[in-house]
Every structure is written in structure tokens, then in C-alpha cells.
Swiss-Prot record:
Residues 149-274 are annotated as: HPPK. One of its GO terms (biological process) is folic acid biosynthetic process. Catalyzes three sequential steps of tetrahydrofolate biosynthesis. CDD domains: DHPS, HPPK. This is Folic acid synthesis protein FOL1. (7,8-dihydropterin-6-yl)methyl diphosphate binds at residues 380, 416, 435, 547, 583, 629-631. It comes from Dictyostelium discoideum. Residues 514-524 have a biased composition (Basic and acidic residues).
Length: 657
């Protein structure tokens, strides 16, 4: 067992029972000896597995200086609780001394010893602290600007819709500023019930704490919640987690929520929207509490909370609603089949641009294994004719309506468009997913699907094909800075072998901070403000899907880099879609790998591009891509069945023979 010693922290705090001691801060000296097994850190070299001396010291100081204890023992107990529950310390000794207590005493003090198991099994142990707003008649000086974090749960009926309905009712008195992802979690405290849907949201309100509690209880009652037994099933459950930074403890309300620290179904959603919010009594962030969960807050196989009676591990996973159906992102890699109702798309132009043929193809895509159909009415390859918005609507809307008529309402449909007018008409016709950031419709959207306008592509300075003249229909790789790509023509590669700027071995240098810098870094930098804009416009976090836009505004090396480092994009927490299907960067990667540099890149309809697409999809699946957008369903579906069996063994669906 490793020992961590923090000696003689000098702080000033309000402590004591006499009237004068409740006003003037006194010098307090705190020493801590903590015991924790850090062998895992030594073997993994992962700093998450160790204890930050600085963070622990700051938490102790912050807690002690802001709390108003009556006794040294109460303060020592509170410090011990922070060490154990906040930092995973297994055993701790806390010495608290008060030099100015009695003139003739040498430094009267109290020393206690506590364990992590003690606090887990005695969750009722109270940390005495300054109570704010501890009566129903409290006057809040921040009325109208109160920031509140709420947790939601439902496991009866249409669980997803129940939470959405509670949002609508909540908006009568609160403004929803942001939401977490939606999670599905196993029941923890009482196992014999259905799984829960959970999320969290940040709201602003002018309601005082007890008025807000009354309002929330009214929502629960109006939605049909019936009190049965503790931790039993419920139509809707809404808990106040934080209210500003207040500490409130009355007979009917306790803020912060007393058991939030052990609940993954609270901490994971809360960390989506308030990762750095500091718990006002534990004095640690939401992220720190999440990391203190067994398994470090990972979303699979989390051991049950300490106060639960079950020994079964908890499964908690992100879900999304598309149309009337709920999808679990970890079940499989979802396949989006491409349906272009255009005369000039680079792979299938003219094949499905009549209503009869488009319906036949949509039916075939579903039969072949597509989970989503992506419908496009405007080609974006270089040189494509730019059609009017009205013509694009006339191409896609009849197809959408006919698909709904023939195939029903359960098939998710996506509209691939640059124009919000087209997106609006497509949604009204029956689409479920759009590339629209207007927020007018609360449906899932795909962000960063970097499609340049046809006019942009047709500007001569931007026609930077990484293909030969016989491959004019392939997707282009475009450098948005208007600079030459490293490999504009594969036939010239042999002439540039000695040029370091064009050497393919140097293309993955992530330290170059030039105009041609890492596309992954650009995508992450650009995604965050777009995500923030979407949430401010009223979209829920679980409705956002990221697409790095393979092949658009990129050299082929940059598209390869995205495939190499896609896991970094996954680090944003959002589901990710990739669309490598038969694109030009695949052809150029193959051509550059050929010994005979005089060979032209494979054409869009070449089988070699199909094999390249399969490779890209398998790579994306390995780092966690959730959706793949493709033309060739049967071949890639089989590849994904194998890939998912390796990469997603926890999936719950059964592979059909």
C-alpha cells in the first residue's frame, strides 16, 4: 500500500460553537496521511490511476475554508470523506489542529482514521456545513438567473418520449440551455424491472429551490407517476442535482443530491454538460467523480453502486431516437445506403432518377441490410451542374413520400442537401435526419459533412483533382487554402521523390502548424462551436452526428489521416459517420502504392475502389465509427458483421445466418 503525506496545511476557517467563533475565521492546521494502492499506475503509466497531490490539497483547503463546522472532529470527518469518496483513498488519517483554542494547550487537535468502505457503507454520514436557503421562505438574490442541473429517468412506457414530454412541461417555467446525451442503463438498486433511459440538462429559472421542487413534482404527477416503493419503476423521475452552488438540506430537499457521487446514470450524463462543475461539499469536479466510479466511468460493465444490494454489473450506453425507433450506438456499425436521384452522380448517376427506379433501389437497399437510406438530389462532384432549389425539392420529395407509402414509417431516411429549404420539405415529407443547423425541426442532424458548393468546385483555382483526366467523376480532394496538393497528378510522382515536401513519409507529421495542418485537429477545432450553436438553437445533444467529410476539402493524405486518427474525433463523445464510398482518395492511395506509377487510378466503378472502401469501413469500425455511408451494401454488410464481432462483442443483436 502506497502512502501519501500532506503535512501542515495552514488554512483559515470558521469553526467552533461560541458566537464569536461563528463570525471570525481562525487558523487551522491540517495534516493527512493517505493510503492507496498505486501499483496499477506504475504498470500502466496512466496518470488517471494515481492521486494528484495538488488537486487533493486544493480540495481539502477549498472545502475547509468554505465550510462552517462546530467541532474539529466534524471537520476531520469531512476531510476524510473528500479523500475517500473524492479521490478513491482506501484508508486515511486526518489530524486537525487549532493553535489558538486554549492559550495553555500546545495545539489542541483531533486525529481520526477512516476507510473508503466506511463511507460507502455509511452513506448517511453528514458533513456539517453552512446551510444556505434551508427554509421554504428563502429569498434568492439571483432570482431569474438561477442555473440548475437536473437528472431525468424513465423505465415505463415510451421511455424516450416520456423524457421529451417532461422537457416540454419543464419549459413552462425553465429555459433549457443544454442537454446531455441520452443513455440506456440497467436498473441498479432493484433489478426486477425494465432498463432506464437517463439524461441530464442545464436550465435557468427564476423559481426558488423549493418552488422548483414543487413544480417538478407536479410534472411527475401530471405524467402519471405513482409512488410504489423506493427505486421502483416510474414513468418519469426528475431530480435536482445542483442549484447554483448552494448547499441545501431540509426535510424534503437536499442539494447537491446526496447519492449522485455513486450513480453512473447521473454522473455520465452530467459530465456531458458540466464536466468541470465543482461539487460544493466534496469540492471535486463532475469528471473527477466519474473517474472515481468503478471502471473509471466507462460506459460498459460498471460495478453496482456501494449502497445497491445487487452484485450484477451495470450496462449504460448511448441511444438516439430516429423517427419512432430508438437505436443503441453500441449495438453495431450502422449502414447508411446511398440513394442518389440524380442524373450525374459519380457512381450511380442516372440509375435511379425516376420514381419507379428509386423505389426499387430503396427496397433493395433495405433488403440488402441498410439501416438508413440517404437521399440526395444534387451532385457535388467537380463540374456538376448546379440545379435550383425548386428542382432539388422536386427530385427528392416525391421519392421520400413514395418510400414512406411503400416501405412504411419505420425506415430511417436522411436528406443529403446543402439547402435548408430542401431539408424542411424533406422533413415534412417524412425524412428523419438532415444536414440542417437551423434547429427548426428537432430531428437528428449530421454536422461537418463538408460538402463544398458546386460553384466553389467549378472555380478553376479549386479544381484540384487527385485523379487523372479519365476519372473526372470521382470525388475531389480540395485544399481550402487554394494551395497545390502534394500529389496533384499521380503520373508526376516519380519526378518528386527527392522533394521532402512531397514525400509521403512526411505526410503524417502532426507537429506541422502550417496551412495544410492536421485535418483531425481542424475538425475538432471547428466541431465544438458548431455543436454549441446547435444546442443553443434547441437541438438536443443526442441528435448530433459528426461527419469528418472524407474526400471533401482535403488532400488524399488528409483523408487517410482522418482514418488513422478517427479515435480522436470520437473523443468529442458524439456518434461519428464516415462516407468513404468509392471516393477519389481511395483511388489515389492505391495508385501511389503501385510500383508502376504510370498506371491510372482505379475508376469510380472499379472493383478495386470497392475493396478500398471495405478497408476504410473496417478501419473506421475499429476506432468506433457508428455509421458508414456506402453504395455497396451486400459486400460491406458482410465485412461489418465480422468487424463488429471483433470490435463490438458486447452487442445485443443476433447475427442472422
Amino acid at each position: 500500500m502506497d502512502k501519501i503525506i500532506i503535512k501542515d496545511l495552514l488554512i483559515q476557517a470558521v469553526i467552533g460553537v461560541n458566537p464569536g467563533e461563528r463570525i471570525i475565521k481562525q487558523n487551522i492546521i491540517i495534516s493527512v496521511t493517505a493510503y492507496k494502492d498505486l501499483s496499477k499506475c506504475g504498470s500502466s503509466d496512466n496518470v488517471i490511476d494515481t492521486v494528484s497531490y495538488s488537486s487533493l490539497s486544493k480540495s481539502i483547503c477549498s472545502y475547509s475554508e468554505s465550510s462552517h463546522h462546530y467541532t474539529l472532529e466534524a471537520l476531520a470527518t469531512g476531510v476524510a470523506k473528500i479523500c475517500c469518496l473524492g479521490f478513491g483513498i482506501e484508508r486515511v488519517k486526518v489530524l486537525v489542529q487549532k493553535p489558538g483554542a486554549i492559550k495553555l494547550a500546545k495545539w489542541p487537535g483531533v486525529q481520526i482514521e477512516r476507510t473508503l468502505d466506511y463511507f460507502k457503507s455509511n452513506s448517511f454520514v453528514e458533513i456539517p456545513s453552512k446551510l444556505i436557503n434551508n427554509n421554504k421562505n428563502s429569498n434568492n438574490s439571483n432570482a431569474g438567473n438561477n442555473i440548475v442541473y437536473l437528472a431525468f429517468g424513465s423505465n415505463l412506457g415510451d421511455k424516450f418520449q416520456n423524457i421529451l414530454n417532461s422537457f416540454k412541461r419543464l419549459e413552462k417555467q425553465c429555459f433549457i440551455q443544454s442537454t446531455s446525451f441520452m443513455y440506456e442503463s440497467s436498473p441498479q438498486y432493484y433489478r426486477e424491472q425494465d432498463s432506464f433511459y437517463n439524461c441530464a440538462c442545464k436550465v435557468s429559472t427564476d423559481l426558488k429551490p423549493h418552488d422548483l421542487l414543487k413544480f417538478i413534482k407536479q410534472i411527475e404527477n401530471d405524467m402519471g407517476r405513482v409512488e410504489t416503493f423506493r427505486n421502483g419503476p416510474r414513468v418519469i423521475d426528475i431530480d435536482i442535482i445542483y442549484y447554483n452552488g448552494l448547499i441545501i438540506k431540509t426535510d424534503d430537499l437536499e442539494i447537491p443530491h446526496p447519492l449522485m457521487w455513486e450513480r453512473d446514470f447521473v454522473l455520465l450524463p452530467l459530465s456531458d454538460i458540466a464536466p468541470n462543475f465543482i461539487h460544493p461539499t466534496l469540492h471535486i469536479t463532475t469528471n473527477r467523480m466519474k473517474l472515481n466510479l468503478p471502471n473509471g466511468g466507462n460506459i460498459h460493465n460498471i460495478p453496482p453502486p456501494p449502497t445497491a444490494t445487487t452484485t450484477c454489473n451495470n450496462i449504460i450506453e448511448k441511444v438516439i431516437r430516429i423517427g419512432n425507433l430508438n437505436y443503441n450506438w453500441n449495438d453495431k456499425t450502422f449502414i447508411m445506403g446511398i440513394l442518389n436521384v440524380t442524373p450525374d452522380s459519380f457512381v450511380d448517376g442516372g440509375k435511379f432518377n425516376t420514381l419507379e427506379k428509386s423505389i426499387q433501389q430503396a427496397t433493395a437497399l433495405i433488403e440488402q441490410g441498410a439501416d438508413i437510406i440517404d437521399i440526395g438530389g444534387q451532385s457535388t462532384y467537380p463540374g456538376a451542374q448546379q440545379i435550383s432549389i425548386e428542382e432539388e425539392i422536386n427530385r427528392v420529395v416525391p421519392t421520400i413520400k413514395k418510400i414512406r407509402e411503400v416501405l412504411g414509417n419505420d425506415i430511417p431516411l436522411s436528406i443529403d442537401t446543402l439547402h435548408h429549404q430542401v431539408a424542411k420539405e424533406a422533413i415534412l415529407a417524412g425524412c428523419n435526419i438532415i444536414n440542417d443547423v437551423s434547429g427548426e425541426f428537432r430531428v437528428p442532424i449530421i454536422l461537418n459533412h463538408s460538402q463544398p458548393t458546386t460553384q466553389y468546385l467549378q472555380q478553376k483555382q479549386n479544381e484540384q483533382y487527385l485523379n487523372n483526366s479519365n476519372d473526372s467523376n470521382s470525388n475531389s480532394s480540395i485544399n481550402t487554402n487554394g494551395e497545390d496538393n502534394n500529389n496533384n497528378n499521380n503520373n508526376n510522382n516519380n519526378n518528386n521523390n527527392n522533394n521532402n515536401n512531397n514525400n509521403n513519409n512526411n505526410n503524417n507529421n502532426d507537429d506541422n502548424d502550417n496551412d495544410n495542418r492536421s485535418k483531425i485537429k481542424q475538425k475538432i477545432d471547428l466541431s465544438s462551436p458548431k455543436i454549441e450553436t446547435c444546442t443553443k438553437l434547441g437541438l438536443f445533444r443526442w441528435q448530433i452526428i459528426l461527419d469528418p467529410g472524407l474526400g471533401f476539402y482535403k488532400t488524399y493524405e488528409q483523408s487517410i489521416e482522418i482514418l488513422q486518427r478517427g479515435k480522436e474525433l470520437m473523443g468529442l463523445g458524439f456518434p461519428v459517420l464516415i462516407g468513404p464510398s468509392r471516393k477519389g482518395f481511395i483511388a489515389n492511395t492505391i495508385a501511389n502504392a503501385e510500383k508502376d506509377k504510370s498506371l491510372p487510378p482505379p475508376s469510380p466503378k472499379s472493383e478495386r475502389r470497392l475493396w478500398g472502401t471495405i478497408a476504410c469501413c473496417c478501419i473506421g469500425s475499429m476506432w468506433g465509427a457508428n455509421i458508414i455511408r456506402i453504395h455497396d451494401i451486400p459486400e460491406i454488410r458482410d465485412a461489418m458483421l465480422i468487424s463488429d464481432s471483433v470490435n463490438k462483442p458486447q452487442r445485443r443483436y443476433q447475427i442472422q445466418k
